[in-house]
Each structure stands twice: as C-alpha cells, then as structure tokens.
From Swiss-Prot:
The lineage of its organism: Bacteria, Bacillati, Bacillota, Bacilli, Lactobacillales. This is DNA-directed RNA polymerase subunit beta'. DNA-dependent RNA polymerase catalyzes the transcription of DNA into RNA using the four ribonucleoside triphosphates as substrates. The RNAP catalytic core consists of 2 alpha, 1 beta, 1 beta' and 1 omega subunit. When a sigma factor is associated with the core the holoenzyme is formed, which can initiate transcription. CDD domains: RNAP_beta'_C, RNAP_beta'_N. Keywords: DNA-directed RNA polymerase, Magnesium, Metal-binding, Nucleotidyltransferase, Transcription, Transferase, Zinc. It comes from the Bacteria. Mg(2+) binds at D450, D452, D454. Its EC number is 2.7.7.6. Its cofactor is Mg(2+); Zn(2+). One of its GO terms (biological process) is DNA-templated transcription. It comes from Lactococcus lactis subsp. cremoris (strain SK11).
Amino acid sequence: MVDVNKFESMRIGIASPQKIRYWSFGEVKKPETINYRTQKPEREGLFDERIFGPQKDWECACGKLKGVFYKNQVCELCGVQVTTAKSRRERMGHIELAAPISHIWYFKGIPSRMGLALDMSPRALEEVIYFASYVVIDPKETDLEKKQLLTEREYREQLLKNGFGSFVAKMGAEAIQDLLNDVDIDKEVAELKEELKTVTGQRRVKIIRRLDVLSAFRKSGNALSWMVLNVLPVIPPDLRPMVQLDGGRFATSDLNDLYRRVINRNNRLKRLMELNAPNIIVQNEKRMLQEAVDTLIDNGRRGRPITGAGNRPLKSLSHMLKGKQGRFRQNLLGKRVDYSGRSVIAVGPTLKMYQCGVPREMAIELFKPFVMAQLVKKELAANIRAAKRKVERQDSDVWDVLETVVKEHPVLLNRAPTLHRLGIQAFEPVLIDGKAIRLHPLACEAYNADFDGDQMAIHLPLSEEAQAEARLLMLAAEHILNPKDGKPVVTPSQDMVLGNYYLTMEEKGREGEGMIFATPEEVEIAMRNGYVHLHTRIGIATKSLNKPWTENQQDKILVTTVGKVIFNSIIPEGMPYLNEPTDVNLTTSTDDRFFMDAGQNIKEVLAGIDTVRPFKKGYLGNIIAEVFKRYRTTATSEYLDRLKDLGYYQSTLAGLTVGIADIPVVEDKHEIIDAAHKRVEQITKQFRRGLITDDERYNAVTGVWRDAKESLEKRLIEEQDLTNPIVMMMDSGARGNISNFSQLAGMRGLMAAPNGKIMELPIISNFREGLSVLEMFFSTHGARKGMTDTALKTADSGYLTRRLVDVAQDVIIREDDCGTDRGLVIADIATGKEMVEPLFERLVGRYTRKSVLHPETGEMIIGDDTLISEDIARKIIEAGVKEVTIRSVFTCKTPHGVCKHCYGINLATGDAVEVGEAVGTIAAQSIGEPGTQLTMRTFHTGGVASSSDITQGLPRVQEIFEARNPKGEAIITEVTGTVESIVEDGATRTREITVKGKTDTRSYTVGMADVLMVEEGEFIHRGAPLIQGSIEPKHLLQVRDALSVETYLLGEVQKTYRSQGVEIGDKHIEVMVRQMLRKVRIMDNGSIDVLPGTLMDISDFEALNETALLNGEMPATGRPVLMGITKASLETNSFLSAASFQETTRVLTDAAIRGKEDHLLGLKENVIIGKIIPAGTGMFRYRNIEPLADLTNAPEVKEVETETVEN
C-alpha cells in the first residue's frame, strides 16, 4: 500500500481499454452470482473467487489449501489464489463488450464533450448512438459529406444510387469511435486557432469551447476514442455486496442487477453475431446493450430510470458518488469513529471549567484497552485475554485502575449541530455515577446546549500527540473568547446572573445601615449573625481590602454594601474595587464620591449618595473581558468558576420565586385602550369619506395599536418595582425581556396572519387577565409561523455555512509577511445617521499600512506595519482621526492563503495569529453560526415608506455571497462629475438625473417613488448610488475596481448582521469576500498558452505574466470576475474538493478529460484521501522539521551502569 501521508498529488484521467484489462483479474462471462444451494460463488460469475479472491482469509474455494503457509499460491483444483478476504475489496474484473459502447458521461454531459470533439450536435450524436441514423464515415468518391446523417431509407437509396461499398456509413457507438479515431487533434487545434483570429460572436464562443476540449485532450494525453468503451470494468464484489437475510432470501446491491443486465445482453449479442443474425436484430441488441451500460454508469441520465421493486430507481455507479449519501460525503468526509459514545447531558455545577463528568459505565468501555494494559502491567491479570474478561465482568480492582487511567487523559465532547469550532472542546473526565454526561454550566453557551434532553457525543484522543493537542489547544478553560468577535463566550447566565444581581443590590434603611467595619471578615460575621443584610449600606476601612487605591483614597473609609464586599472578594487582586456598574470603575478606579474620612458622619454621607444599580449580565461580561485582558486564560477560568459558585450559592439563599400576584396590574390600561379604539374609529371614518387610501388606513390603524402597546410598556417600566422577582429576572438579564413582561402585564398587541401580514385586530388582553377564545385563536397563527420559520431557517443557515466552508477551506495562514505595498482605507461604517460599525472596532487587532499622524499636532501616533492594540486604537479615535490605512486580507499577496500581518490577531486568543491557522474555515463558521439568529423574511413595507421591498436577514446574506442581482437595486453613476440637473416628468412619473463628467455626460431615469441620494450641484464619484437601494456588485466591478467592490460587500454584510445585533469581526468577512474575487478572466492571452475567456487564479495569472515579461514576451490581460460562493467552490483548483461539494459527475468528467492533478493544498481533499490536513500542527513546515545539527559523527556516549535499590 502507498503511505497516504507521503504522496504529493493525485491525478485523474480516462481509462484506456489496455488499462482496464491491466487492472482486471479475469473476465466475468456469466450473469450468475451465488449458487442458491451451496451458497458458493458461481464460476466466471459476478462473485467468482478465481477472479476476485477468496471469501475466507488464507483459504481457497475447495478448502484444499488452508493457512498462511500457502500465501499467494494458486490451488490446482479450484484455481483460487490463497490470500486475504480483503482482496475482494480491491480486485477488479472486466467484461469484453461485443460492440463498442459510448460512455454516457462524455456524451450526455453539458456541454457534450463528445459533440465538441467531433463538432456534432448532441442530437445528431444521440441518433447515431441509439441506432436511429447512419453517419457517413468515409464518403470516398460520392457527393456525400463526412459526418452527414442518413436515415435508414436514405442510406438504402444512396447504396442503390452509388453501388455497394462506394462509401462507408455506420451506426452506433462503433461509428462514433471511428470518427473519434479520425480526428487529428494537433491539426484541428492549429486550424481553430487560425480561425479564432478572425471570427466574432457566437461562432467565436463555439470555437473557444471546442479548442478548450481538444487542447485538454492533447495536454492530458487521453485519446478521444477512450470516450467509447470496448471493455467494461467490474468493480470488486465487496463494494457491491450480496448478503443473506433471515429466511434464506438475499439482499443485493443494485449494481449487481445492473451488471447482470449488461452481461445478459452482451452474451446474447455475441451469440446473435456468431449466428449471423439479421442486421436489424443485431442492431436492436446493440442498442439494448448501450442502454444497459448507460443505466449502469448513470441511471436516469437518459430517458426513464430503470426501477427495481416498489418502483424505486436503481442506484447506479454515479449515484454511489453523488449527494449526501454518496461516497464522498457519507464515507470519505464523515466517518463513524471508534472510541466514542453518546449520552444525555445533565448540569454539573460543582465541576471546574476544564472538567466534565463521565459515567463509569461509559468510561470503562471507552478506556477499555488502556485499562487492560494497566491490569497486565500491574500484574492484576496474567495476559490481555484475562484482563479483557476481568473488564467485562467489571471486577472491583478494575474500577481502581480506571481511576488512574482516566486521570489527565482529556476527552472531547461534541454537540450536534457543530456550527463553529467551539462545538467540540476537550475536558478532563471525572468519573461519576448515573448514566448522563455532566457538563459545566458555563460551557453551555459555546455549545448552545441546555438540559432539556440534549445529547452529546464523547470521543477519546488516543495518541500522545492527540492528547497533547487536546489539552493545549482544545481545553474548555482556554476557550474564553468567541472566534467570531473576540468577546467572551463564557458569560454567566440564569441563576448565576440572578445570584450576583441579588448580591450587589442596595436598599436604603436596611438593618445595620451605617455600621463601619475594619475587615471583610468582620462584615461576614456581622451578616451571619443578622446584624446586617446583604443589601445594607456600610462603611469599611480601605486598607483592609487588598485593592489598588489612588493616593487620596488610601486610609479612608469606603461606602459600599455587604454584598459588594463579598462580590469583590472573588475578583483577582490588582483589579479595582467594583462599587458601581461603570466602565471607569472597571478599568481605572472606584469613584471618589464613595469615600469618607475617618471622623465623618456616615449617615450624612449615605444621605448624599443615591443607591447604585446592581450588576447585570452585560456588566458581568465586561468584567470577564477585562480580567481576560489583564490576566489571560488561567486566571480568567479560575475567576469564572468562583463567579459561578458565588452566583449559584447566592441565588439559592435569595430563593426568588414567581407567583401570579407578582405580575403588576396597570391601573389605567382601559383608558389607553379606549383612546386607541376612538382613534381607530376616526381613521375608519376618514377612509369611508375617501380622504385616505386603504393602505394608509391600514398603516394608521396598526400604528395606533403599536403606540397603545408602547405606552402600556412605558407605564410598566415607569411603575416597576425593582424588588419584584419578575422584574429582577428581567432587569438582571437572567431570563425574559420587556416584551415578555408586557405580554404578561400590559397587552399582547398585534399578531401576524399566516401570510406574514400584520392583522389589524390586536389582542387586547394580557396573560394575567387571560385571553378570550378568539384572541387565543388569533395568536396561534403567529406561533405556528414562528415554528415553521425557525425550522426552515435552520436548514437554510446550515446550507449557507456549508457553501462558505467549501469556498474558504483552503485559506490558511501560510507565511509571516507577504510584503504587499497595498492597504485598505477604513472609516466608520454607517447608514445615514445610524452607526453600523465604529472605526474603533475595525482598528483593534489589525496592522497599519501607513503611519497614523495626529490631525492637529502632526505627531506620529503609530508607525507603519505595527499592530494596533486597544489603547492605541483609543488614542487614534480620541485624536479625531477619521480614516486609517490598514493591512487587509483583501490586499494580501500570499497565494492560496493569507499572511500574519494582513490578517492581524486571532480573535479567539487575542494574540497574533499563528502560521497554520485555518482562518478560512473559522471565517466561514463565524459567518454561518449566527445565521440562525437572522430573520427569514423579506420586509414588505405597507407600500408607503419606500417603493421597493428591501431584502434583509438571511436572504440578504445569501444574496451578497452568491453575488446575485439584488432586489431593490440602486442605479449607480458610471462617470465622476457633477449632478447637473434632476428633471421630473409628471406624465411618465419618472425623474431624469444628468451627471456631467470631464469627458462625457450620462442621464439616468429613476422612478418618482425612489428616494434620491444625490442633490443638484453635488460632486459624485463613479459607482456612487443615485437612489436608495442595494448596488449590484457585478455592475460596480465594471465601473470601479475590485477593491471598491470588496469594501462595499464587507459593509453590506456588516449592516445585515449588525442590524440584528450580531457582531462579527471584519476579517472573517474579508476572507470570504476575497475568495469571491480570486479569479481573472483572460481577455487577451498575449504570448501565454491559455485560451481567451479562461478563468484563472489571480496568483497564477500574475506568476505567468511575470515569467512572460522576464522573457520579453507579451503578457496576457484579464479582468477580475466576481463569483458567487457556490460557483467559486466549483471553480477551485482541487477536483476532489469540488466533486465532494456539488455536481459531482460534471466535475469528475471535466477533471478526467483534462487529466487534472490535485496538489492537495486545501483541507477537504486531504480529509478525503485520509492524509493529515495541512493546517495547524499538520502544516508542512511543522511536519518536515530538519534537525539543526548533524549528529552522525558525534562521539559515542558510554552507557553508565545503574543499579536499582529496592525499598
């Protein structure tokens, strides 16, 4: 066997008849499979042991030669070679076809490769191949033309006219094979290239397509005639198995039926030809054979598919590769693995961040070989077999050994669907009783897990290297930050938030208010003995608290609460004392207003300070981010565990409960409702009088009810009591939001009808009062629509992620610095007055391309090619800089990847990105994972606000990445210049905008309802939109350059995600958008050997041009092409990756003709062939490490004799 990790590349081609015979171990002559009495394979049949190898290891068919001793010997009696039964998965057979047969992939594919090679239409080909017409192969002296089609009648007439043998015309694939053999590729290519110089239009397109196919055959060394089969390969029998079911019946793979049809028809044809049967019978048999082979290769490609029992189409060879259940996606890209298990998850509140609970029963099975080895080593079992029996009996000493084996051996936990890389993390197992896996509560957010019956899979890394990687790179305690935005992904939720919120609350006048303590210990004693409450405001000596005070805060008394003293006791030393939820308090120091001198009256001080709001969920997230920034992972995960324990403990003590009486009643609700009813009546009257249109009436009515609901909500917020448990849950961010609260206490408001339109009748009741039957019925529409939308959205979002991963999977950090001199100018992204993404967020963690100077003083804030930290970014913003030129993925010159400087920091670690990081896959996951949070709907405004429906949410993201023509397209100007005039035309309800440039003037017609983006006299650059809407990126690319398009797409994706409250780092979108513009279409090939119209990678194009210029030749010219992600995935250089994505047969047909070579640069192609992926620690530069010193001639080291001392 070839060592899979050694070979460099993989090539695919068309098999010649000689090659097929060389692969084969014998000819299959009979359609028989297995003898039903003896259960042995029939001779010369589809399962023959002589051809395909023995059914039992090291044993021939008759049983004469048994055992490894006879390895590779051939039995004289039965003729079977003694070898392993596994050879039945490798040895092929063949069928000698009685007539040539066309291969359906090359004849039927689009475009038909056979048709292009012969310059015949696919219809003509079909008529010839399926025996409907003759084709003239050699007209000799007659007035016929070569490749002319003749019907049966015309053929006979020509024979009568010209005499027998005066010309050669044939039918069937045989005729096509003769024609293909006649083609002189070099001559044809030369003629076509000459013709190409003069022709234009459709003819030019056709010539280029023919040239493409012919030169592909010439370069790859495939012969044209190989597209017609004379020999048919038979795949190994274990790949098309036949198994006996209970009750003596057999289940067989469809391929066996298909092969049987081919063999039957082939044998019948041979017999007919031997008998010299009439021509018409032989022709019919040949046609049937052609159809049988077509069905075997690709059932259903031509005509109706052949069906088996129950009208199910049979699965042909092509179907074995295609789709989700095909060979590529089912068996090569995703395999089932050993050393794994799955179980329901339960919460493990006592675990540390890096631990998970594994049930003993599960662990004993997972770690079985390790336990067995240890039992033998400790001499608790004589040999491995005895150890195995011991483990299966579950003897008492097995459990002790298990404890030692499990220690420090990390396991991987995975929850499906794995939407991003945090869906698989490593934990140290802790053995537990029960049958559920215990999961740390803070790991839930990364997995999107809850404990309502979710299941998780557990996997065991086996090798030392795998264990080391799991521990160092995948341990859950290391994954504090989310790769998509660099914010903490482990934020406390629910009970933890509630506990800490309750702990940091303040109340005036609680017992013991104004007491002053010397140390935190005294505070705790006082609280335990009931002198003070958690919420009591007290004083404490600053010097007893180990915190960084400012000079004038030392030796003073800090005014705080009992709970905050406890809360601050778990925060790492060196952090300020947190007394109020503000950023200043978190990053610099506690506010001076909370300090008093030793002699002051504390009651007076307390009277002058308002109560401070408690710490909510968002603030806890900020604290974690700050702790991480200062102390990195280890300290942060320790702090998180303390925070979790404190939160659970305090919420248990607080014992917050919810009863129906906790839902407040708004006193004047009926007044608000009555006012709304009256307003609706007025609007209806106006409509009846014809003062307003139906659309306006509808919008006004829904607006009234929206206002009514909002005023109720406002009343609720104004009157809310912060000690009310429901309000506490909502306010702290533990559970629920204002919308849930107003449905409980205010009114449910307007509902959506099944078609998505808002119904005019609102639900006036709330859940506390209870809904009427009619209201209940109304509200079910919206609820059902919500459920279906979610289900559809999940599928859509998953498919988007799959396409994104496919297009970017080979983008890896390949080098430290590409040395580019280009950069990207960035500023705030904003729509009108609304800020989408501020400059600050875009700067952090990127490298500068030009120095940034202070706009007023001119001093340098940061130099060229330097990493921008948070502090420097803040300085840049404070200096009032509006634009910065940074290194960007868009302008990176690294082929097949990105360099460290153009990418910036790795958001998941906060440090510089490592060479080998698979940034493409991370980018795809970061964009795909929040896809489910985006909305599905295209917003239909009531026909008033704007004329076009603007696509938003998930459909908009797909529209951008697939480079489709957007809905609600904006017209853009093609010239740079001044807006000369905007003229309205009342008759056609349009406006004409004239833009005058330096050289030419253009006019654009827009509708009256379109919202203008320009004014008369305004100076605009080409590519600027004239009206509101989405720009079509392909049009923008024609008008401007690739970088403008990339910048526009980046902004559009950010707008879509940020409008839904999802933050994604720019660099992820940059990686994806760059992949859409990787290709160049050759316009003029210069002196380079490529055809005009060819698509090429930018890096290859530049390299070829460089070579041409150095040799003093004409370089080629090309223009950048914007491709949607699906198209870009299929145009990748790797045929394995493309074939496993979509359109498998088309990709493979094309690759075979071109004799394509896959250099295995990306991740997918390496997974498919089972090679270690070239990313991370599998990167070439980490795998092939050269030793620094040559130690071959080093002096010998003498062995030192040692003795063991037994104690």
